[in-house]
Amino acid sequence: METKRLVLRRWEDGDAADLYEYARDPDVGPIAGWPAHANVEESLRTIRGVLGVPETYAICSKGTGRVVGSISLKLKGSTDLTERDDECELGYWIGKPYWGQGLMPEAVREVLRHAFEDLGMRCVWAGYYDGNDRSRRVQEKCGFRCQWTTDEVDVPLMHEVRKGHVSRLTKDEWASDLEDGSVPA
């Protein structure tokens, strides 16, 4: 998949160094619920074990070809937010040097198009932990509406319990937002 500034493609073993460059930053992973990576080998294991699954994409800069983040659609069986075949959960992160440039909303919009048009989803869910205002803003910019907040969400990779927020965007809402221009294509 492509956008104006990005290519979204499957993760490859050769992406481990790029992944490590951003995943080692304590400002990136922990706020999303996963610990900073300790070395390139851990990043390679993550590519092979976590990021190498269907509907998980490396976000690459068209200008440099380098990986700058990750985005995924977690389908039935790999998400706690739905048990339906026509619903999925969106997950994403982007390296700190790329924060504030509008790249993540750009990637999310393309993945939403893919979810609704190519995969036939009727609803996409997304969550964020309290304090992750950047993730909240990405969801708002892309048309997601908050559905509920849970005071105690288990964050197993961090061995913590946090407050979590869950948002949703239906296919009808997405289409309406595109039609009236409230969310850019």
What residue ranges belong to the model's regions?
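Acyl-donor (CoA/ACP) binding surface of acyl/acetyltransferases
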Residues: 1-31, 56-185
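Short linear motifs in intrinsically disordered
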Residues: 13-14, 47-49
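Conserved GNAT-fold acetyl-CoA-binding loop/helix
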Residues: 27-48
